[in-house]
Amino acid sequence: MNDIFIGLQLREHFMAEENKKGGFWASLFGRNKKQDEPKIEPIIEEEKIKDIEPSIEKFEANDLVEEEKIQEISTALEPIEEIIEAKNLEDEFQPVVEIETREKPSEGGFFSRLVKGLLKTKQNIGAGFRGFFLGKKIDDELFEELEEQLLIADIGVPTTSKIIKNLTEHASRKELQDAELLYQQLKVEMADILEPVAQPLEIDSTKKPYVILMVGVNGVGKTTTIGKLARKFQAEGKSVMLAAGDTFRAAAVEQLQVWGERNHIPVVAQSTGSDSASVIFDAMQSAAARNIDILIADTAGRLQNKNNLMDELKKIVRVMKKYDETAPHEIMLTLDAGTGQNAISQAKLFNEAVGLTGISLTKLDGTAKGGVIFAIADQFKLPIRYIGVGEKIEDLREFNAKEFIEALFVHEEE
């Protein structure tokens, strides 16, 4: 018995040891199998879900409230925005109250464009003289410097000498105490030169058609000036016809026809190389038959054939007088201000050939040589009808001497 009891104890001991080691006995009795590990799944407690749901609903409710507030604000602002927009439109179309002044017209008008157009010329004369006279005493040296500056501005020797002579006489009579008074007197002297020639063109309605013969060298803006004048007269209620008398340049004829088509103005033209006098004669007949108020005739400007050109212009005038002995009623020379002293020689040449009655000075906005207008006015005493300070139709305006002088001498801050 003792032996059996001891044997059972030994077997249990060995089995216990095998279980620990995972040996044979453990395999035999299935004790070595690993139990399947339970799958770990995310566990969301229902109570936490219940706690979160009210928070989400609260946030969503807050968002809706914010959106409603934004919508209410936007709706409230709409009438204000409409009022502001209406006020802006009202301001935009509100007529500007013009302050009466003898110095210059209202801001934004032709005077404003004239001031801008004369910026380059003002650097040499006019407002550009303010710094020149500042702090200087009146003596011979000052007059010499002034004379040099006037010549640089293309005022020319004869006109410059005349201005200096008059200023010197005022100074010798003790009428000018300082350089500022000399500056003001210079303005007066220059105005005195321009005022006698500021004569606008007056159309005689008893003469139908009233014939304007345009002359000038190629490139001065003659054909463009014709188009602008035609539009101006048309806007005044006058009927206009154009005659393409520059038959040597196809481009000139085409340009005139474009102006005519654009403004519904009839243009009389013939083929390139036709006789200019014949074209203009036909135009006079046509204008009379249609009861046209104003006929503007273009002419050639080939200065390289100076003698031939002058002979042709003389012929045109003779032929025109055969139809109407009072025609042409205006012989207007177009000059480019940028040519400086060359404009003087051109004026002399055309005046001797056909006898000018008026001048249009173009391209004043693109040159520093605008001082030539004083030389032209002083030497020829011919009426200056129009000046051009830009490419727009309204930039060709009747010449006003006082307005021109004010624009020339006005300062940026004034």
From Swiss-Prot:
Recorded topology in the membrane: Peripheral membrane protein
Class of this enzyme: hydrolase
Alphabetical list of InterPro entries matching this protein: AAA+_ATPase, P-loop_NTPase, Signal_recog_particl_SRP54_hlx, SR_rcpt_FtsY, SRP/SRP_N, SRP54_GTPase_dom, SRP54_N_sf
Keyword GTP-binding (UniProt): yes
Protein residues bound to GTP: 216-223, 298-302, 362-365
UniProt-listed CDD domains: FtsY
PANTHER family the record matches: SIGNAL RECOGNITION PARTICLE RECEPTOR SUBUNIT ALPHA (PTHR43134:SF1)
Catalyzed chemical reaction(s): GTP + H2O = GDP + phosphate + H(+)
Species this protein is from: Haemophilus influenzae (strain ATCC 51907 / DSM 11121 / KW20 / Rd)
Gene3D superfamilies recorded: P-loop containing nucleotide triphosphate hydrolases, Signal recognition particle SRP54, nucleotide-binding domain
Keyword DNA-binding: no
Membrane-spanning ranges: none
Matches recorded under Pfam families: SRP54 (PF00448), SRP54_N (PF02881)
GO BP terms, alphabetized: protein targeting; SRP-dependent cotranslational protein targeting to membrane
GO cellular component terms, semicolon-separated: cytoplasm; plasma membrane
Function: Involved in targeting and insertion of nascent membrane proteins into the cytoplasmic membrane. Acts as a receptor for the complex formed by the signal recognition particle (SRP) and the ribosome-nascent chain (RNC). Interaction with SRP-RNC leads to the transfer of the RNC complex to the Sec translocase for insertion into the membrane, the hydrolysis of GTP by both Ffh and FtsY, and the dissociation of the SRP-FtsY complex into the individual components.
Subcellular location: Cell inner membrane; Cytoplasm
Family: Belongs to the GTP-binding SRP family. FtsY subfamily.
Subunit structure: Part of the signal recognition particle protein translocation system, which is composed of SRP and FtsY. SRP is a ribonucleoprotein composed of Ffh and a 4.5S RNA molecule.
GO MF assignments: ATP hydrolysis activity; GTP binding; GTPase activity; signal recognition particle binding
Protein name in the entry: Signal recognition particle receptor FtsY
Enzyme Commission number(s): 3.6.5.4
